[in-house]
Amino acid sequence: MPTGDFDSKPSWADQVEEEGEDDKCVTSELLKGIPLPTGDTSPEPELLPGDPLPPPKEVINGNIKTVTEYKIEEDGKKFKIVRTFRIETRKASKAVARRKNWKKFGNSEFDPPGPNVATTTVSDDVSMTFITSKEDLNCQEEEDPMNKLKGQKIVSCRICKGDHWTTRCPYKDTLGPMQKELAEQLGLSTGEKEKLPGELEPVQAAQSKTGKYVPPSLRDGASRRGESMQPNRRADDNATIRVTNLSEDTRETDLQELFRPFGSISRIYLAKDKTTGQSKGFAFISFHRREDAARAIAGVSGFGYDHLILNVEWAKPSTN
């Protein structure tokens, strides 16, 4: 077998090692004259095997911050780390700015400014958005029963025609006597009650002007026949309403002023305590017409009176 001299082909490991040595030489030669990204043109110190590591260097140029550090690997090789940061200015509220100036304590007493991973966990920011539903508010306003009574004038003062009771009128001591004097001059009577339709005439005195005794058979109305009260009572039951949640200070006159604007009233019954004479909290109002009673229920039910909300409903017919 013939033998001859020939060049052996180098292995792949030898090629990589030779290329690495060439790269190190070229890199060390080029870094000597290349300026830093921050504009620093000072030459880089040479990293010799026996020399100590240079101290870290920090350079700030505008909003760019460059930090240069040197470290040694386990095999004794030295290398340089260059980190570049962009400085951002963020606006914070006064409360956040004051908290950042607080002095740290405990395990973080000697930590630099900013959060420490060992003691602080920084989570994602959660943005809260407060939404007010105007539609729900509009629905609540529409369902409010008090809004239905805003355009209605339920109570009218007899003295100043205001929206309050006559007994609580601020002008009753001044305008009241003046109206009485004017009514007397015009020939009007303010003391007599207004006669309602269907109301009977008051019974005259038993004695005549001469002072003689008049027997009952000869008095006014003796020739008239008595009328049955059953039909009238049934009509009253059909147009009677029941008012509850009244205050203890309520009187018949207050109920008369409250329900008179809705129609003619035939009778009012206010339940009272026998010993104290105060109201028990409910009353019955009878109208001459059922339509007036229906308007009174729609207008007064839910109305605020003497710091209480009145409840008005149809009265149950009597079984007697």
UniProtKB/Swiss-Prot annotation:
PTM summary: Phosphorylated. Phosphorylation is enhanced upon serum stimulation.
CDD domains linked: eIF3G, RRM_eIF3G_like
Gene3D superfamilies: 3.30.70.330
Listed Basic and acidic residues bias regions: 221-233
Residues recorded as bearing Phosphothreonine in the entry: T38, T41
SMART domains to which the protein is assigned, alphabetical: RRM
Domain of life: Eukaryota
Primary localization: cytoplasm
Entry keywords, A to Z: Cytoplasm, Initiation factor, Nucleus, Phosphoprotein, Protein biosynthesis, RNA-binding
Region of interest (Disordered), ranges: 1-60, 204-233
Location relative to the cell: Cytoplasm; Nucleus; Cytoplasm, Perinuclear region
GO biological process per UniProt: formation of cytoplasmic translation initiation complex; translational initiation; viral translational termination-reinitiation
InterPro entries (alphabetical): eIF3_g, eIF3g_N, eIF3G_RRM, Nucleotide-bd_a/b_plait_sf, RBD_domain_sf, RRM_dom
GO molecular function ontology, one term from the record: translation initiation factor activity
Subunit description: Component of the eukaryotic translation initiation factor 3 (eIF-3) complex, which is composed of 13 subunits: EIF3A, EIF3B, EIF3C, EIF3D, EIF3E, EIF3F, EIF3G, EIF3H, EIF3I, EIF3J, EIF3K, EIF3L and EIF3M. The eIF-3 complex appears to include 3 stable modules: module A is composed of EIF3A, EIF3B, EIF3G and EIF3I; module B is composed of EIF3F, EIF3H, and EIF3M; and module C is composed of EIF3C, EIF3D, EIF3E, EIF3K and EIF3L. EIF3C of module C binds EIF3B of module A and EIF3H of module B, thereby linking the three modules. EIF3J is a labile subunit that binds to the eIF-3 complex via EIF3B.
Family recorded in the similarity comment: Belongs to the eIF-3 subunit G family.
PANTHER family attached to this UniProt entry: EUKARYOTIC TRANSLATION INITIATION FACTOR 3 SUBUNIT G
Function: RNA-binding component of the eukaryotic translation initiation factor 3 (eIF-3) complex, which is required for several steps in the initiation of protein synthesis. The eIF-3 complex associates with the 40S ribosome and facilitates the recruitment of eIF-1, eIF-1A, eIF-2:GTP:methionyl-tRNAi and eIF-5 to form the 43S pre-initiation complex (43S PIC). The eIF-3 complex stimulates mRNA recruitment to the 43S PIC and scanning of the mRNA for AUG recognition.
Protein name: Eukaryotic translation initiation factor 3 subunit G
Gene that produces this protein: Eif3g
